Amino acid sequence: MNCVYIENLTAYFPNINFEEISDSNFFIIDILQNEHKHLKSLRIKPNEKILITNGQGIVAFAMMELIGKTNYKIRINKIIKQFNELPFRLGLAIGIIASKERFEFAIEKCTELGVTDIFPIISDFSQTKNINYERIKSKTIAAITQCKRSCLPQIHQPISTLELIELVTVQGSAYYFDSIILADENGIYPTSNLKNSKNIIAFIGSEGGFSERELNSFPAQTIKWNLGHRRLRAETAAILTIGILSL
């Protein structure tokens, strides 16, 4: 079943009670083709079932009723909130990688695995400090339609490692995470058994890892994970770590 992204989905039914929608109590929305050209590229046919995500916590189970010359008529059969989302907040703090393609690949795959917050970090060894926000957002949109989830991750502005460590350790703040994972060769072997954690953030360094100054700034309760004997690229370490945490 194809999944499509329509950011303004709820604008088509502002006064609908989601709980009352069903196969026998459906409604039709009318979408202009020139506003959603990506639907045409999917070659969806009449009577084909599709999923629609708005990236803001809603997925609609739908069916293509009619493909007109200028519009689509889509039948909405059911709406589910927080579809295919993890039961906890999962952050990825990853050093900005010099290769934009590798950096964007890491973000795309970690989005598929359920990450909710992305923090591009400027570490002492970072070779670049800038990101292309629009390109990264487009990668996350592609990822949530691939894995059929309801929420886009929040992409935060680039921040230094030390500043982010300070933010995520302040209880009560919007940035607070109660568990910090650090990819480190001196750590323990990973486990996904963090049942008491409601918010987990994983720190992955860029090329060269983290400096001694940065490593010494992590709080004592930081959980260090050894990701194996082989030296991994930053994007591989990010995907592996988030994959374990999402299990």
Annotated model-derived regions:
Residues D184-N196:
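Strongly charged, low-complexity linkers/loops
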Residues F83-S179:
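RNA substrate-binding interface of SAM-dependent RNA methyltransferases
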Residues M1-K81, E134, F177:
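N-terminal positively charged helical leader segments and presequences
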Residues E212-L247:
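Structured adenosyl-cofactor binding patch, chiefly the S-adenosyl-L-methionine
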Residues I28-D30, P87-G91, I200, F218-L227:
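Glycine/charged-rich beta-loop-alpha catalytic/anionic-binding loops adjacent to active sites
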Residues I155, I180-L182, T222-N226:
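Conserved beta-strand scaffold positions in the cores of enzyme catalytic domains, especially
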Residues S197-R213:
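A C-terminal functional module that forms or caps the active site or interfaces directly
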